[in-house]
Amino acid sequence: MKLLSLIILTYNSEKDIYDCLKSVYQYNNIGDALEVIVVDNQSSEYEAMRIRLSTEYPQVRIVQNTHNGGYGQGNNVGIRIATAPIVAIMNPDVRLLMPTFAAMLQGFADKKVITCGAKQILTSGQQGWSIVCSYKMPPILRLVLRRIALRTDHYNYQYMYFAGAFFLVRKESFLKVGLFDENLFMYSEEPDIFIRLRKQFPDCKMCYYPNIQYLHKADSREFSPKRYRVQLTGDTYVFKKHHIDYRPHLVVNIWLTYIFQLRAILKHNAIESATYREQRKIIREFLRS
C-alpha cells in the first residue's frame, strides 16, 4: 500500500532530475510505501532521460505530458494518477538533506491537517522563502512579518503559507478545490492554492516543520527578464482572482529594488545592480497596464 505519491515535474531538467531522485531514495524512510511519478512537459531530450531513468530507477513511473501546459497543468497530470492518499509536490532542483517523509506523514494523523511544509535552504546556505505571508496583508506588514517568521521559525497557518518547491497535501482535499489552477503557467501557485484550501476547509490545519530541511537551488538561477514577467503575470492574476489590490504590492517592490540596488552598488556588484534596475523597469510596465 502506498502512503505517499511524490510528483516531480520536469522540463529540460536533465541536469537536476538524477540528483533529485538520488536524494529522494537516499533519504526515503518509508520504503515501498513511497510512489514516485515523474511527469515530463515535452522536454527536448525526453527519450534519453526516459531511458536513463528507466535503467537507474525502474520503480519510478514516467509519464510524458501531451503538451507543455505549465507547472500546474503538468503536476495535475501526476496528481490524478497518484495512488496514495497523500501527495508530495517537488521541484527537480530540490535535494533532500535528511530523512523526511515519515516525520511529515505523521502530521496527517490529525484529520484536520491537509498540507505540510519544511524549511528551504538555498545553495548559499541561507534560508530560502520557506514561509510567505498572505497576499491579503498590507504589503509592508507582509514583508516585516515574513522576516520575523523566517528568523523565528514561527508559522501561523491562518496568515501564512510555505514554499511550493516541496510540500505535502491530502489528495482528496486538493481534488475538492480543483488542484492547481492551470491558467497559471508558472509561479504564484502557492498563494492561490492556500487561499482556496482555507476557503474550502475553514477549520483545516497546515503544518510547518522547521527541523526538516531541504535544499532548493533557486539562487543558482541567473536572472531572466522573461521569467520575471511570467512571475509578475502570475502574481497579478492571483491578486485579481481573489479580489486583492495588487498595485500597493508592486509599489513596495519598486522601492525594494532601489534599496537592493543601492546595496549592490556599495558592494561594487554591477550585475546585481543591473538586475534590480531591470526588475524595476518591468514592475513599472505592470503598474501601467
What do these predicted ranges mean?
Residues V87:
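Short aromatic/hydrophobic "clamp" motif used to bind/position activated sugar donors
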Residues H154, M160-L179, N183-Q213:
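A short, conserved alpha-helix in the catalytic core of glycosyltransferases
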Residues Q64-A82:
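Glycine-rich, basic loop-to-helix element that forms the pyrophosphate-binding segment
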